């Protein structure tokens, strides 16, 4: 049985003045799927991420998530609906501990009002306790159980990447968007990341992945969408994408006649 569609992107375009960064791109992500979004440098991958997650407002087209049109919703509203992301450039709070960084991620699900937090109401204290418990569990989940009290800025690069994933998961997402999570990783770290992404999917999350390492993408994704110069040029299974002439030409170029 085919899983229901979680995210539907239809004719999505993003323009900056006279520059078209994304041109009428359409694709779907189904629940429980790991979808790879690939393409050469400047293809529009991160622009697409930014349009989905509310960093950029689309010039045209629509993004529908779990039945809700995102339209002009603000970033925090999109997070509350169930979309979380990491970034190409690590964006942690360096002076905070690993545990504190993940606890911050849980704020997206807190229901205590500002006055309630100021007076430390019973609900606020309960949510604080639950947030710490969840953060501890997520650090263990990403393999950082012994790093919780270390400042984020002092962590090894690979652990900082994992910490970003833990913080994103702390928001309670239905869709996790990973923007080049293997950047700067050595082969063993990449293999561990592939295992982690698979476990994340097995826990019920849906994953949208941007990654330049083609071997990693082919290994971990269920389906791949390929962009070039802001347009979609292919959409299919990894084996199909590997043999697609348009994809090969986009990455390797076409010889002169």
Show which residues each predicted segment covers:
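Glycine-rich phosphate-binding loops of nucleotide-dependent enzymes
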Residues: 2-257
């Amino acid at each position: 049985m085919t899983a229901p569609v979680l995210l539907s992107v239809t004719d999505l375009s993003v323009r900056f003045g006279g520059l078209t960064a994304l041109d009428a791109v359409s694709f779907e992500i189904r629940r429980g799927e790991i979808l790879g979004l690939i393409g050469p440098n400047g293809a529009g991958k991160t622009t697409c991420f930014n349009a989905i997650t509310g960093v950029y407002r689309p010039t045209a087209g629509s993004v529908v998530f779990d039945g809700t049109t995102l339209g002009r919703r603000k970033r925090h509203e999109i997070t509350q609906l169930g979309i979380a992301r990491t970034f190409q450039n690590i964006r942690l709070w360096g002076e905070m501990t690993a545990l504190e960084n993940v606890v911050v991620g849980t704020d997206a699900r807190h229901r205590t009002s500002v006055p309630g937090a100021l007076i430390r109401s019973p609900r606020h204290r309960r949510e604080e306790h639950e947030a710490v418990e969840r953060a501890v569990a997520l650090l263990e989940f990403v393999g950082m159980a012994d790093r919780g009290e270390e400042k984020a800025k002092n962590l090894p690069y690979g652990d900082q990447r994992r910490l970003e994933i833990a913080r994103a998961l702390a928001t309670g997402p239905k869709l996790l968007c990973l923007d080049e999570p293997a950047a700067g990783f050595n082969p063993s770290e990449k293999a561990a990341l592939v295992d982690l992404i698979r476990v994340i999917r097995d826990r019920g999350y849906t994953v949208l992945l941007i990654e330049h390492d083609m071997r990693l993408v082919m290994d971990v994704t269920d389906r791949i969408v390929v962009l070039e110069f802001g347009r979609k040029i292919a959409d299919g299974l990894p084996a199909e994408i590997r043999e697609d002439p348009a994809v090969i030409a986009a990455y390797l170029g076409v010889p002169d006649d």
